[in-house]
UniProtKB/Swiss-Prot annotation:
It is an enzyme of class 2 (transferase). Belongs to the RNase PH family. Keywords: Nucleotidyltransferase, RNA-binding, rRNA processing, Transferase, tRNA processing, tRNA-binding. Its EC number is 2.7.7.56. It comes from Aliivibrio fischeri (strain ATCC 700601 / ES114) (Vibrio fischeri). This is Ribonuclease PH.
Length: 238
């Protein structure tokens, strides 16, 4: 039995609140249970120097956590003058995931930056960030179409992510903190809505996992992501 009473394949209650802030072209408050992340997508009519004149756009991301998003206060990274390794790893993952969902040539020489700011953490902050960022990105692109900055939609489809793991000898989906901290194995999976995988990150924290357990976790991830993408579509249809 999971601490929350959820079944092995059951994701937490997920809410995607669009237009959460006033100024960004796309903004979403994404909630995976008690994990809450604000995702804002900002459009700039330029690209990085190394892309200038190549007729392609760019999608990038930044990630951060409020000092008291966790049980005890964490010092702001800005106070130390540099980002931590975990932060850089996560924001690169978010950016790679979003770029996989966009035709960069169709975007033209424009850049979209998605900022993911965790305001409350209870496990799965990176997967929640990717899920919310995809919706914020879709809204930003729709804004670009409405304002004449794009003629057609460069998004190839929705992208979402979920964590899976081995907890008490059982494969489970969408780990909250109490499960994540005690899991034998922790894995993050990012997928497109057509079922193609963008990224699989897995680590045996306490005990190695078998090939069958890997397959079980991937199957749970696909089922969970299918459920999450339906929630993305429903949010964007509102």
């Amino acid at each position: 039995m999971r601490p929350s009473g959820r079944t092995a394949q059951q994701v937490r209650p997920i809410t995607l609140t669009r237009n959460f802030t006033a100024h960004a072209e796309g903004s979403v408050l994404v909630e995976f249970g008690n994990t809450k992340v604000i995702c804002t997508a900002s459009v700039e009519e330029n690209v990085p120097r190394w892309l200038k004149g190549k007729g392609k756009g760019w999608v990038t991301a930044e990630y951060g956590m409020l000092p008291r998003a966790t049980h005890t206060r964490n010092r702001r990274e800005a106070a130390s003058g540099k980002q931590g390794g975990r932060t850089m790893e996560i924001q690169r993952l978010i950016a790679r995931s979003l770029r996989a969902a966009v035709d960069l040539e169709a975007l033209g020489e424009q850049m979209i930056t998605v900022d993911c700011d965790v305001i409350q953490a209870d496990g799965g902050t990176r997967t929640a960030s990717i899920t919310g960022a995809s919706v914020a990105l879709a809204d930003a692109i729709n804004h670009m179409i409405a304002t004449g900055k794009l003629k057609s939609n460069p998004m190839k489809g929705h992208v979402a992510a979920v964590s899976v793991g081995i907890y008490n000898g059982e494969a489970i989906c969408d780990l909250e903190y109490v499960e994540d901290s005690a899991a034998d194995t922790d894995m993050n999976v990012v997928m497109m809505e057509d079922g193609k995988m963008i990224e699989v990150q897995g680590t045996a924290e306490e005990a190695p996992f078998s090939h069958q357990e890997l397959l079980d976790m991937l199957a749970l991830a696909q089922q969970g992501i299918n459920d999450i993408i339906e929630k993305q579509k429903a949010a964007l249809a509102e």
